């Protein structure tokens, strides 16, 4: 019998990528619960409704009535992407991040605890670990949590909440923490879409501070394949890091994109973000050694595909 999954935030960047992957590569029935924020893709939800294995429920994970509507059946798993995720927005207005990321996760954990689903996959971020110095080893799953902004603090809070349910209630849950993602469907406010947009308009690319902050980049589809593998083979109660092993400074990243587009290197250094972490790097050896995950898309191929998508979709 085909399995049935609930995907929260399935109209957003990574959630949509995962939803399409599951519909394409499995025979599972998929329900997406999404409140359709500014960063979502409602037009893609309409297209997916043509698939008889797909169902869309508009709702907010922090609202119990919406949770009840979505959990009108028992699922084989809940894959929880839904989150407020933009750091700058969290600095200026933290409340939506607490409401969605913490309270929403609580409501989902309660639903799974009550038997509405067999498993919870909680999608988190490497930002919960804080930042690294240039010569520090990459984050592992046992690195202490040390968030430096309201967004990462809200995600760390939700991680700890899920882990507390695992220890206290034996909740069947797994946490994943991934490095920076890029690819089609990412909202225009994010870094790579911003670089592409400015380059195409002949404008200087804005860089926070000196532009030498380091991030580890992973193509979103590779991230989603890792989540699918963890859903199928991961161990309940565990945390799995997912990373690209592709560290680049923000300035180096911008240079790669500008070169690909044939544009002159024009940068505008702007005031640095409050609480801006200097370096992220993920050690994904646990995922690779225990479950056999390997990324399939090189950085060069992923960037080319991403630029092509934004060119085709005029974003």
Swiss-Prot record:
Q: Which parts of the sequence bind substrate?
A: 85, 125, 180, 190-191, 206-208, 215, 250, 272-276
EC nos: 4.2.1.46
The residues listed in the UniProt record as binding NAD(+), with positions renumbered to this chain, are 13-14, 34-37, 60-61, 81-85, 100, 151-155, 181
Cofactor names: NAD(+)
GO annotation terms (biological process)? nucleotide-sugar metabolic process
Q: Which reaction does it catalyse?
A: dTDP-alpha-D-glucose = dTDP-4-dehydro-6-deoxy-alpha-D-glucose + H2O
Keywords of this entry: Lyase, NAD
Active site annotation, chain numbering? 126 (proton donor), 127 (proton acceptor), 151 (proton acceptor)
Pathway recorded for this protein = Spore coat biogenesis; spore coat polysaccharide biosynthesis
Per UniProt, the cofactor note for this protein states: Binds 1 NAD(+) per subunit.
**Pfam families named in the record:** GDP_Man_Dehyd
Q: Which GO terms describe its molecular function?
A: dTDP-glucose 4,6-dehydratase activity
Q: Which InterPro entries match?
A: dTDP_Gluc_deHydtase, NAD(P)-bd_dom, NAD(P)-bd_dom_sf
Record function comment? Catalyzes the dehydration of dTDP-D-glucose to form dTDP-6-deoxy-D-xylo-4-hexulose via a three-step process involving oxidation, dehydration and reduction.
Summarize subunit and interaction data from the UniProt record for this chain. Homodimer.
Cross-referenced NCBIfam families: dTDP_gluc_dehyt
Similarity comment: family membership: Belongs to the NAD(P)-dependent epimerase/dehydratase family. dTDP-glucose dehydratase subfamily.
Q: What is this protein called?
A: dTDP-glucose 4,6-dehydratase
Name its species: Bacillus subtilis (strain 168)
